[in-house]
């Protein structure tokens, strides 16, 4: 038995210099990263920025156009400052996207490891559960779950995480299946290493790259899904600022004051586009074979 056979799986590591060099080659990804960082900083600094209260109603100033004195981006149908509501809505969208994708990742990775490493009834149970959830249309199943739990951001995040974790389960299980019979895993098992040690030292390192890539691409999808539920009245509830609910309440004024709909719609578009471009760059960096 050689030491090489017992060596733990390599962990994908990239230096900061290599990351900067890879990003500099992709102008779109760099611009998307800058935009994303600015959005995150604005969202985090919202309580300390000189912005109007996003929930304060000012009926005489309702539906003001952009560049109105005191309202750089105009107001909505209740006279609330759209700039303030967009910034505060970014906090909700980022929380929903990262939180929902994170919850789906934790559940999906755990079930994927269990279903891929262990055989028998455990594997069958995990995969049948995954197949059942993936058999339903994504957003329709989320709507059904929220309808049962009740409207609200927390329940919407739970629902989207439930319908989203099977993606991680299938991804992780496929990786675990490919390495559970490898020589270094068999050698560790023959030497009496317990399963938790084998999983931590030999399996988890192989999962880092695909899971990081999947998560970076999934956050944008989760933001879009939570915005969709809020648009339907099942997510964030009034008067909390949320891009999806801003679209829902402003759509009736799309002809009279199109900025009420265009601004939150543009915010969702740019946020999701930035996340997808950054996710693609992360994928190309961690797995150069995917670069066309």
Describe each model-derived feature in a short phrase.
Residues 1-109, 113-114, 120-121, 128, ...:
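Gly/Trp-centered helix-boundary motif
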Residues 72, 76, 82, 106, ...:
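Generic hydrophobic transmembrane alpha-helix motif, especially the helices
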Residues 85, 184-191, 199:
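Helix-loop-helix units of permease transmembrane domains in multi-pass membrane transporters
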Residues 43, 47, 113-117, 146-148, ...:
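Transmembrane helix-loop junction
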Residues 39-43, 143-147, 160-166, 217, ...:
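Alpha-helical transmembrane segments of multi-pass membrane proteins
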Residues 92-96, 111, 123-127, 154-158, ...:
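Short alpha-helical transmembrane interface motifs in multi-pass membrane proteins
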